[in-house]
Amino acid sequence: MKILDGKAVSLKVKESVKVRADELKKFGVEPTLAVVLVGEDKASQTYVRAKEKACNEYGIKSVAHRLSENTTQNELLALINVLNLDDSIHGILVQLPLPKHIDTNVVLAAIDPRKDVDGFHAVNVGKLVSGLDGFVPCTPLGVMEILKEYGIEVAGLNAVVIGRSNIVGKPMANLLLNASATVTVTHSKTKNLKEICKNADLIVAAIGKPFFLKADMVKDGAVVVDVGINRLDDGRLVGDVDFDEVAPKCSYITPVPGGVGPMTIAMLLNNTILAAQAKIAKN
């Protein structure tokens, strides 16, 4: 059993980001990410600070817009419009979740697809489904980067994705399909989940339920990727996979923490660099 070390892979990606950011600056372009945070959600504030810190460390300028909880949808859309038109901004990220009075789909649709570094705009979703180049959500993209870094050939594998969210499950399935895996997506209504998982060469768990994937659901030699991040009552951070039970059966497995988590921000930085490079190419 080998550990898939997402922290190490993320550092490699971020070092590459820094090199390319320095190259862009030679052309007079400072790669810039605008981060929009609405409200006082503690987890969101933590994520935004982590994104700002990573940007500053690896050569990307971050511009934060912190808006109050009672910001109206129209006020938020007006800000996004300003950022869309600002040539110095290459990437726009609206931190989710948004307050309940704001329609997330309307807000995401307002972002210029060329600046949609989170990969949530319908144009980029459509490109992913069609196998075309576009921005891809950072977490599933990070999973693919880990698999690539460890030389795990996805083509021809039976892959099971547990979870069908727009942020992880669906894009993960499409990335694996585009890489020629045979993909099954499972969810809360799936029957015979245990049997389906037992046939999988590769399992990606992304449902947000601690210790959901047990050893009796995994065949010997499978690759298991744990996207879950769950905080237990005792303060421990654990994944969707019962690591101690499942790991001995795996050929490769990601830990939590230190697996997929660090890749999300690394791929966000990478997407921001791609947006800045595309801008130069266009000009």
UniProtKB/Swiss-Prot annotation:
The keyword NADP applies. One of its GO terms (biological process) is tetrahydrofolate interconversion. Catalyzes the oxidation of 5,10-methylenetetrahydrofolate to 5,10-methenyltetrahydrofolate and then the hydrolysis of 5,10-methenyltetrahydrofolate to 10-formyltetrahydrofolate. It holds the Pfam family THF_DHG_CYH. GO terms for molecular function: methenyltetrahydrofolate cyclohydrolase activity; methylenetetrahydrofolate dehydrogenase (NADP+) activity. NADP(+) binds at residues 163-165, 188, 229. It catalyses: (6R)-5,10-methylene-5,6,7,8-tetrahydrofolate + NADP(+) = (6R)-5,10-methenyltetrahydrofolate + NADPH; (6R)-5,10-methenyltetrahydrofolate + H2O = (6R)-10-formyltetrahydrofolate + H(+). One of its GO terms (cellular component) is cytosol. Its EC number is 1.5.1.5, 3.5.4.9. Belongs to the tetrahydrofolate dehydrogenase/cyclohydrolase family. This is Bifunctional protein FolD. Homodimer. Pathway: One-carbon metabolism; tetrahydrofolate interconversion. Keywords: Amino-acid biosynthesis, Histidine biosynthesis, Hydrolase, Methionine biosynthesis, Multifunctional enzyme, NADP, One-carbon metabolism, Oxidoreductase, Purine biosynthesis.
